[in-house]
């Protein structure tokens, strides 16, 4: 992956760091804005050609269950 073209930070301890422009950080509480309810903590991120900024969210109601969502589908929980 070309890290210079997609805003990804440099490799840290053999793992990718969050993008420098990330909307959410690891551990942030978020929920889906609409549709089926999902609320939890950000545990990772991903990027694809169609989703340049997406997050893996572990459910607060069902620990261990993780769903991935594009940034536009999520909002921060106070």
Swiss-Prot record:
Catalytic reaction list = (6S)-5,6,7,8-tetrahydrofolate + NADP(+) = 7,8-dihydrofolate + NADPH + H(+)
UniProt keyword terms in alphabetical order: Antibiotic resistance, Methotrexate resistance, NADP, One-carbon metabolism, Oxidoreductase, Plasmid, Trimethoprim resistance
Q: Which residues are listed for NADP(+) binding in this entry? A: 32, 66-69
Q: Name one Pfam family in it.
A: DHFR_2
Top-level taxon? Bacteria
The broad enzyme category this protein falls into is: oxidoreductase
Q: Which residues bind substrate?
A: 68
Instruction: Tell me which Gene Ontology terms the entry assigns under biological process.
Output: one-carbon metabolic process; response to antibiotic; response to methotrexate; response to xenobiotic stimulus; tetrahydrofolate biosynthetic process
Q: How would you summarize the oligomeric state and partners of this protein?
A: Homotetramer.
From the Swiss-Prot or TrEMBL record, give the protein name.
Dihydrofolate reductase type 2
């Amino acid at each position: 992956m070309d890290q210079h073209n997609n805003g990804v930070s440099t490799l840290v301890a053999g793992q990718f760091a969050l993008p420098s422009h990330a909307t959410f950080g690891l551990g942030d509480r978020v929920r889906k804005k609409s549709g089926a309810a999902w609320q939890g903590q950000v545990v990772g991120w991903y990027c694809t050609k169609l989703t340049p900024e997406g997050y893996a969210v572990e459910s607060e109601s069902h620990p261990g269950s993780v769903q991935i969502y594009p940034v536009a589908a999520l909002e921060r929980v106070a």
